[in-house]
């Protein structure tokens, strides 16, 4: 018999680095979840842009079960068929010629930054070690990646931090240009800053970064952990901009809920990563890569990407209607199904309160800082789920505006 558990047990047993919602989800199907009490929620959080095909997608369950009945793990002393097939699919679908598999976005970004330093050291010299990143970015929680992320709140308690990392203002080419020089080995940027407020890069900004990197022989790294795998209406967001990175990192939606990450690059850059320079125990395991292969099969189609664009329009139309009623948002922005509603000054700092009220109303949403409500639903969310979920979100907005909201 299974141990009976409650939300209170989290506070008793877990390291307190999170403050989870007061309910515990126990079952999901598509874009719906149910908690221990049987209450239904429409899921517009998507596991923070992970559940690209919703919960318990039949094809993903089938792929996982089929591989689970074969074998689970061998370690990096052996390769496996699902990993090789997934690598080929990613290469065929992108600019990449080489793939490194890992387990998360942080690991993918760690690998990307290490590759950039190794390439610069081997080809130029150890003095070429500078990394330029951007304020309010998020690249992971390892010491290297949290230092590259431009949010001191996440890194200030862990000094001394890795050196030679500087931060420019996002979408400000002059700010970046002032920092990028011949000692820069890499520039790492999110095409859409997710945690930083759902802010899409301008085309001129990314094109300018490409030109600066070419001029100074620095590698351009696109962190597509949140924007990748169809989230923006293209398989990867770089395809919107006509700007090709040297390295791309991907995770989150790649496994549709099963943990996996990957770093994509070219043969030339990958060639410096010789045996022993980097590694992973679980990365590229057959369970993860079997599921991710099926995710790509489903998402990397014109029909799916057209559907994302159509659903984007449906969200924007309904969110604008909600805003016309309540006047809570100064801006609604984003690409595809990564959307952010920026709160008016009157409601500044209340994004978390809105998310809490939304959950009470039966819809799960995210925040991106204190002033932005974020949506990252499944790419196959239905019209009915969009309508029902946003009706519930409107109820949460109404409660907040009329003073009926309460913390908790």
From Swiss-Prot:
Membrane spanning residue stretches: none
A Gene Ontology BP annotation from the UniProt entry: arginine catabolic process to glutamate
The protein's annotated pathway: Amino-acid degradation; L-arginine degradation via AST pathway; L-glutamate and succinate from L-arginine: step 3/5
Cofactor requirements of the protein: pyridoxal 5'-phosphate
EC numbers on record: 2.6.1.81
Swiss-Prot/TrEMBL keywords: Aminotransferase, Arginine metabolism, Pyridoxal phosphate, Transferase
HAMAP family: ArgD_aminotrans_3 (MF_01107), AstC_aminotrans_3 (MF_01173)
Family classification: Belongs to the class-III pyridoxal-phosphate-dependent aminotransferase family. AstC subfamily.
Protein name: Succinylornithine transaminase
Organism per entry: Salmonella enteritidis PT4 (strain P125109)
């Amino acid at each position: 018999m299974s141990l009976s558990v409650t939300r209170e047990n989290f506070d008793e047993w877990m390291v307190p680095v999170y403050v989870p919602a007061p309910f515990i989800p126990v079952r999901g199907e598509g874009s719906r979840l149910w908690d221990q009490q049987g209450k239904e929620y429409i899921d517009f959080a998507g596991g923070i842009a992970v559940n690209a095909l919703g919960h318990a997608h039949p094809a993903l369950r089938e792929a996982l079960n089929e591989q689970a009945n074969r074998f689970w793990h061998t370690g990096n002393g052996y390769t496996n068929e699902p990993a090789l097939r997934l690598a080929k699919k990613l290469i065929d679908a992108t600019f990449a010629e080489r793939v490194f598999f890992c387990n998360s976005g942080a690991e993918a970004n760690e690998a990307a930054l290490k590759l950039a330093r190794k390439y610069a050291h081997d080809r130029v010299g150890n003095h070429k070690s500078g990394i330029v990143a951007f304020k309010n970015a998020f690249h992971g929680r390892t010491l290297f990646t949290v230092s590259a992320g431009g949010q001191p709140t996440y890194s200030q308690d862990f000094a001394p931090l890795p050196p030679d990392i500087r931060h420019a203002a996002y979408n400000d080419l002059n700010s970046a240009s002032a920092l990028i020089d011949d000692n820069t080995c890499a520039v790492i940027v999110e095409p859409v800053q997710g945690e930083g407020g759902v802010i899409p890069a301008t085309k001129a900004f990314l094109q300018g970064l490409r030109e600066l990197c070419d001029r100074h022989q620095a590698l351009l790294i696109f962190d597509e952990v949140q924007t990748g795998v169809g989230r923006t209406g293209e398989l990867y967001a770089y395809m919107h901009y006509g700007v090709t990175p040297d390295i791309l990192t991907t995770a989150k939606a790649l496994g549709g809920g099963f943990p996996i990450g990957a770093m994509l690059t070219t043969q030339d850059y990958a060639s410096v990563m010789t045996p022993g320079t980097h590694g992973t125990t679980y990365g590229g395991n057959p369970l993860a890569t079997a599921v991710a292969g099926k995710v790509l099969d489903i998402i990397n189609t014109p029909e799916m990407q057209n559907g994302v664009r159509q659903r984007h329009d449906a969200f924007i139309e309904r969110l604008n209607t909600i805003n016309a009623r309540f006047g809570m948002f100064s801006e609604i922005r984003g690409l595809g199904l990564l959307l952010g509603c920026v709160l008016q000054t009157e409601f500044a700092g209340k994004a978390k309160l809105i998310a809490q009220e939304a959950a009470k109303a039966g819809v799960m949403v995210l925040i991106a800082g204190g002033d932005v409500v974020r949506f990252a639903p499944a790419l196959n969310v239905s019209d009915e789920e969009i309508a029902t979920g946003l009706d519930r979100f409107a109820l949460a907005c109404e409660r907040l505006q009329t003073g009926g909201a309460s913390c908790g």
